[in-house]
């Protein structure tokens, strides 16, 4: 019997199969899911911003550049092999329109780009993503199968 484990904003959790990780309220935030398909362990981070920048020492789960290292460390503690880790992500929407404003305000795009940078640095392949648009998402990640269910209002539900 699987348990659904909720991951809050600026939070990360790891678990073993048959558990499912869930986060809601992904607008410009990114839900990044990493798992080892052989050991059937994985984790999810709900990342709010691309880099810690001038806020070092804060909550590492809040930022892509610090959350990814922590997420991988915690997954490895559950018995995963770094060489088998795979990732999927969702979110990164542009929830509000800022015509004529600088790219710095496109937080969703910047979050997705930074997660990709961190995955490349860590040598973890990104298998699939569902990012962008102007709508929020709720995701459920099955760490046993690696299935990521993405649910949206007015845009349906899909498994990636």
Curated annotation (Swiss-Prot):
InterPro entries: CheD-like_sf, Chemorcpt_Glu_NH3ase_CheD, Cytotoxic_necrot_fac-like_cat. Keywords: Chemotaxis, Hydrolase. The gene is cheD. This is Probable chemoreceptor glutamine deamidase CheD. Its EC number is 3.5.1.44. One of its GO terms (biological process) is chemotaxis. The keyword Cell cycle does not apply. It is an enzyme of class 3 (hydrolase). It comes from the Bacteria. It holds the Pfam family CheD. CDD domains: CheD. The keyword Hydrolase applies. It catalyses: L-glutaminyl-[protein] + H2O = L-glutamyl-[protein] + NH4(+). SUPFAM superfamilies: CNF1/YfiH-like putative cysteine hydrolases. Belongs to the CheD family. It comes from Desulfitobacterium hafniense (strain Y51). GO terms for molecular function: protein-glutamine glutaminase activity. Probably deamidates glutamine residues to glutamate on methyl-accepting chemotaxis receptors (MCPs), playing an important role in chemotaxis.
């Amino acid at each position: 019997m699987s348990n659904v484990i909720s991951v809050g904003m600026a939070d990360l959790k790891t678990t073993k199969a048959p558990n499912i990780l869930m986060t809601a309220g992904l607008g410009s935030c990114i839900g990044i899911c990493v798992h080892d398909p052989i050991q059937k362990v994985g984790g999810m981070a709900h990342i709010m911003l691309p880099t810690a920048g001038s806020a070092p020492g804060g909550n590492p789960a809040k930022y892509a550049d610090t959350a990814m290292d922590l997420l991988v460390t915690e997954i490895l503690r559950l018995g995963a092999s770094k060489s088998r880790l795979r990732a999927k992500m969702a979110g990164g929407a542009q929830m509000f329109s800022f015509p004529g404003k600088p790219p710095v305000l496109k937080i969703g795009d910047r979050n997705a780009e930074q997660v990709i940078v961190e995955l490349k640095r860590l040598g973890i392949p990104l298998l699939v993503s569902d990012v962008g648009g102007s709508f929020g998402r709720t995701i459920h990640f099955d760490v046993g199968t690696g299935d990521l269910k993405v649910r949206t209002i007015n845009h349906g539900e899909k498994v990636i």
